[in-house]
Amino acid sequence: MEKIEFQTKLILIIIIIIYIFLHYLTNSYSKVPDQSDEPYHLNQTLLYVNNYWKSYNKQLTTFPLTFILTSIYLKLRRHGIGINKKDITNKIYRKEYQIYLSDGRVCSIILSLITIFIFSLMIKNNNLLLITFFTFPIKFIYSFLIYTENTSILFMILYYYFEEYKKVNNKFLLFFIGLLSVLSRQLNIIWINFFPLMNCLEILFYKKINFNILFDNIFDILKKYIHIALIDSLFIIFFFINKCSFVIGEKNEHIPKIHFAQIIHFLFYLLWHFPFLNFKLYEMFKNKDKKKKRQWIKNSIILFLLLNFFSLFTITRRNIFEHPKHYNRYYYLGIYYKRINRIIMLIYLSFLYGSFITDYLKLFKKVKFISWIICNLLSFCIEGLVEPRYFINGIYMLMILINDDNEKESKELSYYLYDNYVNFIFQSLQDIYMVHNLVTKLFNAYVY
């Protein structure tokens, strides 16, 4: 096992302390947000705790691996055992509710800590990237709640660790971890195919585009990734048995659709969660290289035209507007569906990311980054629902890729991905519903 430096160990200890503190905060009060899926997740977990394996909530869309793992933890803790199925379905267990919820969240924290530890082994003591990984806002919030993201990210990172970092040849182990990754979230089927895709593109782009070389090597690729081919086959069988749907429940709400507007939402999402990205635009304005500036303007105009074209493929779920507390509602009504605001946003995004294209075009011409772009597009451009959680896998994979790359551009780009603690404090913590309640109660207690 790789040696972990003292600074990295210290950061890991601080992370554990932060998780313990935030777990205390989130469990100080029993109130759960109106838009939270946690009650559904807890109910399903309690059904498994009491061996009701055939019951599955129709509102849950993912495979049940997260709830199975959480139920195992609750059983070991002797919590939730002996509750009647009818009581679980009707939520008639309010007296012990907070105990079950709290222990289920502990399981999520354990999964998150394992993920962070594995990531720390892979990044070779790149503490900047480790802090970014930990503080990444949308994932950070779900790290101590009962959500599928914790299991999904864990097995995706674990699969990458064994497949590419440790170069394990045990196909059964890789098949097992890859399967667990897909069983935690269906869209992970795209990300475990990242490596076969990269291999195919490396052969295809060898010296020049040559499909004959690719076809000649296709059986070698299948042999190398036979475990992935088997998982893909099982997933295809599931897809057709499941009436051509990727999800378990709410099939009508998650019909695969071409949704290129997700690219716009993804770019805006990056801008919102990584405020340092904005400095790149400032640097480009200050740059005195006229040739580079002309290239930047050219790239920005092309990007603006593309983003406008993508906006034609906008899909909006009606229930977003029916729920006044849904965060996407404010984005749609306040920015995206107001023509002037949307144009201003697209112009800004175009010039900002145009500067990145100008500086890092050499980097993103590499096969692994082309593969990353393809997997990203596949993972969220077939989904009608705009959900920031769907972007997490792509961001984490990008962190891994730039860490593995020794190019000057990669090292520089890693600094732009650094999500500083100012953003962590003022953005992430404000989204945690318990903090507001705690501050209000403390203020009332001491002032009044």
Task: Tell what function each PLM region has.
Residues 49-58, 69-107, 144:
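Juxtamembrane segments of multi-pass membrane glycosylation machinery
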Residues 130-131, 135-140, 157, 162, ...:
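Membrane-interface alpha helices of multi-pass inner-membrane proteins
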Residues 181-332, 430-447:
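Membrane-lumen/periplasm interface segments of specific transmembrane helices
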Residues 102-126:
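Transmembrane-helix motifs of polytopic, lipid-linked glycan transferases
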Residues 29-44, 56-85, 368, 390, ...:
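Extracytoplasmic catalytic/substrate-binding loops of multi-pass membrane glycan-assembly enzymes
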Residues 1-26, 124, 294-301, 363-365:
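Start-transfer (signal-anchor) and selected internal transmembrane alpha helices
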Residues 151, 262-277, 328-358, 378, ...:
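Hydrophobic/aromatic-rich transmembrane helices and adjacent perimembrane loops
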Residues 141-152, 187, 387-391:
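Short acidic/glycine- and proline-prone juxtamembrane loop motifs at membrane-interface regions
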